[in-house]
């Protein structure tokens, strides 16, 4: 794949690349929508990646061609936020570059290819942000850590791209393997590598494409953080991690009246989900995969009933994620586990499938949702990396 990528770079830019970089997609294993409330998560890098062949150029322009899209050229001598670039690739390039300006910015040409498909639930945007951060970090000899590169990606997405997001996606992509993250202090998150070999669990991790895209769903995601912030304000706090659960339940009638029932239910989900992360982490540390799966099921139920990130508001005829969850549960027949992961509302769901059921399970999913809808994942040990210095 690297050789093909280098050839495509040469054909497009008329010269040979100097480097090849890679950043993986990720899957959230535990902690749905807890990261933006300074909570806890478990996540893993997966064997889907965004690759870039790169060569420096003489100026301060980043010329980036991504397969299937038009060439994007961004002069990073200008690092101001451009309102017209909101929700664009250009905004991410400028946003990531802004955090490297003290190292003397250099322009580069990049040919990008990816099998972390947009809307796949594997966080293609985070993989792209980590890829950009890894490129700048190397070509400028900036010496940023994997954690710092993740934080830069989140900053670019929040401030330049205009999408509120937590830090889990970027952290999992940047660090790699299976990790537990405590975001109590997001400036200094506690990242703990998990010494667990998923391949020995007796299960396969499957990601199922529901067929629903993330277009026009930014308001749905923003509503979650907005409603949780409203709850926090009643307690004089900014994030739910800092709100005492006992105080929340003592004043729950007041919270319902001030914020509405959906906000209350979403807060209950976050309180309980943080506890589940700790219990799942303990189960993994003790090699107790059955207990881990028990809490996967609980997480999925809570996301659907309380967090309510399965069906977008007002959607009646199209409820693709809900259908995919129901289909997967039917095919599993009480075994394994299934849950919505990541942002929810669209994209993919996650299933833990017993090895003896994988073939029949994927066939059943593909029959109902279309060929290739069920993808079997493996855990990738590396995060964002320099793959090759080209000769």
What are these regions (language model features)?
Residues 1-26, 51-86, 180-339, 351-391:
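C-terminal nucleotide
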Residues 1-20, 24-40, 73-78, 85-200, ...:
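Gly/Ser-rich oxyanion-binding loop with an adjacent helix/lid
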Residues 40-58, 175:
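Structural signature of FAD isoalloxazine-binding scaffolds in flavoprotein oxidoreductases
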Residues 45, 89, 317:
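Short, conserved glycine- and acidic-residue-centered signature motifs
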Residues 346-347:
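Active-site pocket scaffolds in enzymes
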């Amino acid at each position: 794949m690297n050789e093909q990528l280098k050839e495509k770079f040469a054909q497009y830019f008329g010269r040979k690349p100097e480097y090849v970089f890679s950043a993986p997609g990720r899957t959230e294993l535990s902690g749905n929508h807890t990261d933006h409330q300074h909570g806890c998560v478990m996540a893993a890098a997966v064997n889907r990646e965004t690759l870039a062949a790169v060569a420096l150029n003489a100026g301060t322009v980043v010329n980036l061609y991504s397969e299937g899209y038009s060439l994007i050229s961004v002069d990073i001598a200008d690092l101001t936020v451009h309102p017209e670039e909101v929700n664009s690739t250009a905004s991410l390039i400028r946003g990531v570059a802004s955090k490297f300006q003290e190292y003397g910015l250099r322009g580069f040409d990049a040919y990008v290819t990816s099998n972390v498909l947009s809307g796949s639930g594997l966080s293609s945007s985070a993989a792209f942000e980590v890829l950009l951060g890894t490129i700048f970090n190397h070509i400028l000899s900036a010496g940023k850590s994997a954690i710092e590169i993740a934080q830069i990606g989140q900053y670019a997405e929040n401030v330049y791209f205009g999408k509120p997001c937590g830090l889990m996606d970027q952290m999992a992509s940047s660090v790699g393997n299976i990790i537990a993250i405590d975001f109590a202090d997001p400036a200094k998150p506690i990242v703990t590598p998990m010494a667990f070999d998923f391949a020995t669990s007796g299960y396969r991790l499957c990601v199922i494409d529901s067929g629903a895209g993330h277009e026009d769903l930014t308001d749905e995601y923003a509503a979650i953080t907005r409603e949780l912030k409203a709850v926090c304000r009643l307690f004089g706090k900014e994030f739910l991690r800092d709100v005492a659960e006992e105080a929340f339940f003592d004043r729950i009638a007041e919270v319902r009246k001030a914020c509405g029932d959906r906000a209350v239910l979403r807060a209950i989900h976050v309180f309980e989900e943080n506890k589940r992360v700790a219990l799942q982490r303990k189960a993994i540390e003790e090699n107790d995969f059955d207990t881990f799966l028990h809490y996967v099921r609980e997480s999925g139920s809570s996301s659907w009933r309380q967090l309510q990130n399965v069906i977008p508001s007002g959607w009646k005829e199209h409820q693709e994620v809900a259908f995919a969850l129901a289909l997967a549960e039917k095919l599993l027949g009480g075994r394994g586990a299934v849950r919505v992961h990541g942002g929810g509302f669209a994209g993919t769901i996650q299933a833990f499938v017993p090895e003896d059921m994988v073939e029949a399970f994927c066939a059943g999913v593909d029959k109902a949702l279309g060929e290739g809808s069920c993808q079997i994942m493996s855990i990738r040990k590396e995060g964002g990396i320099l793959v090759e210095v080209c000769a």
